């Protein structure tokens, strides 16, 4: 029998400031981080404050659906 699927899933965190209009950026585009989360411990979407090299500052990165 196959092993039961784990509770860990891969999630993509997208810079919230890059998706807004009129934000001063170094490069065009949107920056994304790839990480893992435990579905049982964190059922709500992740929101982390991380550095965005496009905006050149620490911004809120929110989980997106892929």
From Swiss-Prot:
A molecular-function term among this protein's GO annotations? structural constituent of ribosome
User: Which Gene Ontology cellular component annotation is one that this UniProt entry carries?
Assistant: ribonucleoprotein complex
The record ties this protein, via InterPro entries, to: Ribosomal_bL33, Ribosomal_bL33_CS, Ribosomal_bL33_sf, Ribosomal_zn-bd
**Coiled-coil region(s) at which residues?**
none
Which PROSITE patterns does the record associate with it? RIBOSOMAL_L33
Subcellular location(s) per record:
Plastid, Chloroplast
The record's section on Pfam families has: Ribosomal_L33 (PF00471)
Q: Which domain of life is it from?
A: Eukaryota
- Keywords assigned by UniProt, alphabetized: Chloroplast, Plastid, Ribonucleoprotein, Ribosomal protein
Q: Which GO terms describe its biological process?
A: translation
Q: Give the main location.
A: plastid
By its UniProt entry, which Gene3D superfamilies does this protein fall under? Ribosomal protein L33
Listed NCBIfam families: PRK00504.1 (NF001764), PRK00595.1 (NF001860), rpmG_bact (TIGR01023)
Q: HAMAP family, alphabetically?
A: Ribosomal_bL33 (MF_00294)
- Give the UniProt family note: Belongs to the bacterial ribosomal protein bL33 family.
Q: What is this protein called?
A: Large ribosomal subunit protein bL33c
Instruction: Give the originating organism.
Output: Gnetum parvifolium (Small-leaved jointfir)
* This protein's encoding gene: rpl33
